[in-house]
Amino acid sequence: MPKQVIDKDKLVDQAYSIAAREGISALSVRKLAAACGIAVGSVYMYFPTKADLTAAVFRRFFGQALFEECCRVDGSESFVDYVRKLRGALGEALAQMDVDWFAEMRRLPRSEHEALEAARGPMLAHMEQGLQHVLEADPAVVHSRLVGALSPEKLCPFVLGTIFTSLMEGSDCEPLFALLDASLYEAVADGVASGSVAAAPDEMKDC
């Protein structure tokens, strides 16, 4: 007889595993219940709709991709280095999947798309805040340049959008990194400042 209760985090872990292996569009409450050996009703206790389950898997993706490696920042890390790390973490998380994550999301029905949008908003805002924190704390940045189109409020969403575009297209972000180096830092004899000016370490902070 199936177990009737299960920890919510374990449910999300199993759902994420199914989505990574078969695609998020293949995920269903019944499939999750069967994989966990529990009654379907036990899943509905935590996720009343498939859209709720899809949103939880989406949040799990960002949690795995970002929070452990990218959410803690320190004053010794340049903005461009942090952007590289962010792009690398997202790319690594996608590479671990057996399916095209973005193509799968496009196949979802409208109700699940709306749930994803609702879940994505706060996460993107959190990522933009992290980018702004690192940008403003980078002592090598020429801060007088952070105005107009290069203001943190405009630059960070642009950087994040470019990262996601590169992930969807399967391209690298080297042009973005080069533009950031040229736009934000003073050139020095052996390279741009972002690669040659060392900042004194500050206390670790959560973004």
Where are these regions (language model features)?
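N-terminal intrinsically disordered/low-complexity leader segments
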Residues: 1-6, 144-146, 193-207
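Helix-turn-helix
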Residues: 10, 14-52, 56
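Short, charged helix-capping/linker segments at alpha-helix termini
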Residues: 25-26, 142-150
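Hydrophobic alpha-helical connector segments
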Residues: 56, 70-96, 152-156
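Short, basic, alpha-helical segments at the C-terminal edge of helix-turn-helix-like DNA-binding modules
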Residues: 59-65
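Helical hydrophobic small-molecule/effector-binding pocket
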Residues: 80-106, 122, 164, 168-171, ...
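Amphipathic alpha-helical packing segments from all-alpha helical-bundle domains
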Residues: 92-96, 103, 112-141, 150-157
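Conserved NTP phosphate-binding and transfer environment spanning the P-loop NTPase/kinase superfamily
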Residues: 172, 180-189
